[in-house]
Amino acid sequence: MTRQRIAIDMDEVLADTLGAVVKAVNERADLNIKMESLNGKKLKHMIPEHEGLVMDILKEPGFFRNLDVMPHAQEVVKQLNEHYDIYIATAAMDVPTSFHDKYEWLLEYFPFLDPQHFVFCGRKNIILADYLIDDNPKQLEIFEGKSIMFTASHNVNEHRFERVSGWRDVKNYFNSIEK
């Protein structure tokens, strides 16, 4: 029997990219942005005068290599990997300098995944999977399988997709559909 496929986004789903960006922006621009203040907003809209700084941070060698893993992501992805084919689909084209760091990060924190299942892409409509777990509504709306929105500060007002709020919710979602 063929196993179903789950494609999982990296930034803001497996990795706490926003937390690292906010920390770096606060330090370099002498700001005091709190994560709670971002609910329903994108960082670039809150501080348009620092959009260049944000892009500089994202382009720095090592930035994506040093991100924190989202709570419970490793254990849940490992469990899902026992029953599903797991693919990591990260929209790396926005920051092409991130490829190597993202690859090394995935090898370190998700060593049980097949590196041949790491997909560095732009638009995720190219991904042939049964499920996509992503925080970006634009990626979810073009995906042809079942779209699952992973809660992030910028998408809290989005209601078009089934939602999971953290990796324990992901585990519960897939446990509820297993036969």
Swiss-Prot record:
GO BP term (any one): pyrimidine deoxyribonucleotide catabolic process
Enzyme superclass (EC): hydrolase
Keyword tags: Hydrolase, Magnesium, Metal-binding
Entry EC number(s): 3.1.3.-
Protein species of origin: Staphylococcus epidermidis (strain ATCC 35984 / DSM 28319 / BCRC 17069 / CCUG 31568 / BM 3577 / RP62A)
Lineage of the organism: Bacteria, Bacillati, Bacillota, Bacilli, Bacillales
Family according to the record: Belongs to the 5'(3')-deoxyribonucleotidase family.
Active-site residues, as the UniProt record annotates them: D9 (nucleophile), D11 (proton donor)
InterPro entries named in the record: 5'(3')-deoxyribonucleotidase, HAD-like_sf, HAD_sf
GO molecular function: 5'-nucleotidase activity; metal ion binding
Protein's name according to its UniProt entry: Putative 5'(3')-deoxyribonucleotidase
Residues reported to bind Mg(2+): D9, D11, D135
SUPFAM superfamilies on file: HAD-like
Gene3D superfamilies named among the record's database cross-references: Deoxyribonucleotidase, domain 2, HAD superfamily/HAD-like
Cofactor dependency: Mg(2+)
Task performed by this protein: Dephosphorylates the 5' and 2'(3')-phosphates of deoxyribonucleotides.
